[in-house]
C-alpha cells in the first residue's frame, strides 16, 4: 500500500471516468450561457409558494392584516423571477440550441417568461384547491385539532402543494422541473406523486408514507388514500427494441368518493367506480362497479396459549 502514487491513481481514475463509452446517457453536454436547473432555487420556489398560499404558516416574516399584501407581493415577485430562471433551464435542457444567442434561445426566454407569469397567476386557483385538501384532511382525521395543525404538520399538504404547482408546469410542457419539484416532496414526505397525475378537489392521504401515484392516474373528488397505497401500472407494451412505449394510459382511474386503505395495490388502466372501498393489503387489477367493496380474505389461525406466570416474558 505504501508504494501507491496518489497522483498516478488520480490521473488514471480521471482518465477512465472521462472515457466517452462510460458516459453514454450519463453526461449532459452543457453549452456556455445556458442556465442549469438548480435544486436550491427550486427549494426556494417551493418555500415561497407555501408562504404565499399559507401566509403566516410558512415564510420568514410575521404576517398580519396590515402587512399581508406586502409580504405576498414580495414573495410573488421573487417566485416569478426564480421560476423564469428555472423554467428556462428546463426548456434548455429539453431543447438544446447550438448557441446561447441564437433565435431559438431567444424564443425559449420568451416562453419561460410567459410560463412563469402564468404559474404565478394560477396561485389563487392552486390555493383554492389546497384549501379543499386541507378541509378533507381535517374532516378525515379525528386526531387533528385544527386546520393549523393540518397545514403545519401533515405531510399530505406539503406533498400536494408541490404536486399542484408541478402539475401546472407539467401541463405547460416544461421539461424536468415539474418532476424535480414532486421528487422534493417525495424525499420530504415519503409521498410519490407524479406531476402528470390528475387529482380532483378534497383529496387527502392519511399518514402518507409509501404512497405512489403514477403519471397517468386520474383521481376524482373526495378521494382518500391511506399509507402504502400504490396506484401503479400492471404492464406496458414494448416497442420493437424491447423498450417501454411512453405516454400511454396505464394507471388507474379513481372516481369520486373512493377510499383505499393502507398498503392496497391498484394496478393497470382500470376504473374504480364512485364510492368504492378497497380494503387494506388488497390487490385490485379489474374494474370495480360503483359502491362496491373489496377486501382481502384473512385466514384465521387460532392459537391457544396459556400464559403461566408470564411464561418468561
Question: What is the meaning of each model-derived region?
Answer:
Residues 1-180, 309-313:
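Terminal amphipathic alpha-helical/low-complexity segments used for targeting or macromolecular assembly
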Residues 185-302, 306-307:
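Structural signal for interior beta-strand "rungs" in well-ordered beta-sheet cores
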Amino acid at each position: 500500500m505504501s508504494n501507491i502514487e496518489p497522483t498516478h491513481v488520480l490521473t488514471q481514475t480521471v482518465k477512465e471516468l472521462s472515457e466517452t463509452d462510460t458516459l453514454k446517457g450519463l453526461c449532459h453536454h452543457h453549452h456556455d450561457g445556458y442556465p442549469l436547473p438548480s435544486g436550491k432555487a427550486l427549494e426556494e420556489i417551493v418555500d415561497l409558494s407555501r408562504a404565499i398560499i399559507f401566509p403566516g404558516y410558512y415564510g420568514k416574516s410575521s404576517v398580519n392584516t396590515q402587512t399581508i399584501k406586502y409580504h405576498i407581493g414580495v414573495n410573488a415577485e421573487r417566485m416569478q423571477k426564480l421560476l423564469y430562471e428555472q423554467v428556462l433551464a428546463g426548456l434548455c435542457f429539453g431543447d438544446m440550441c447550438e448557441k446561447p444567442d441564437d433565435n431559438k434561445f431567444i424564443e425559449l426566454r420568451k416562453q419561460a417568461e410567459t410560463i412563469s407569469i402564468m404559474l404565478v397567476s394560477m396561485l389563487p386557483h392552486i390555493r383554492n384547491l389546497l384549501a379543499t385538501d386541507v378541509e378533507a384532511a381535517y374532516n378525515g382525521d379525528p386526531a387533528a385539532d385544527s386546520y393549523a395543525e393540518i397545514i403545519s404538520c401533515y405531510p399530505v399538504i406539503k406533498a400536494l402543494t408541490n404536486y399542484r404547482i408541478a402539475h401546472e408546469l407539467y401541463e405547460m410542457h416544461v421539461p424536468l422541473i415539474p418532476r424535480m419539484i414532486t421528487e422534493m416532496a417525495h424525499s420530504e414526505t415519503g409521498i410519490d406523486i407524479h406531476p402528470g397525475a390528475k387529482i380532483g378537489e378534497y383529496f387527502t392521504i392519511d399518514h402518507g408514507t409509501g404512497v405512489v401515484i403514477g403519471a397517468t392516474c386520474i383521481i376524482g373528488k373526495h378521494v382518500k388514500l391511506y399509507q402504502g397505497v400504490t396506484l401503479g401500472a400492471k404492464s406496458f407494451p414494448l416497442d420493437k427494441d424491447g423498450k417501454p412505449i411512453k405516454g400511454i394510459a396505464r394507471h388507474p382511474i379513481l372516481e369520486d368518493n373512493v377510499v383505499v386503505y393502507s398498503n392496497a395495490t391498484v394496478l393497470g388502466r382500470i376504473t374504480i367506480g364512485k364510492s368504492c372501498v378497497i380494503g387494506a393489503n388488497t390487490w385490485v387489477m379489474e374494474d370495480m362497479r360503483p359502491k362496491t367493496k373489496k377486501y382481502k380474505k384473512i385466514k384465521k389461525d387460532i392459537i391457544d396459549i396459556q400464559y403461566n406466570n408470564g411464561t418468561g416474558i
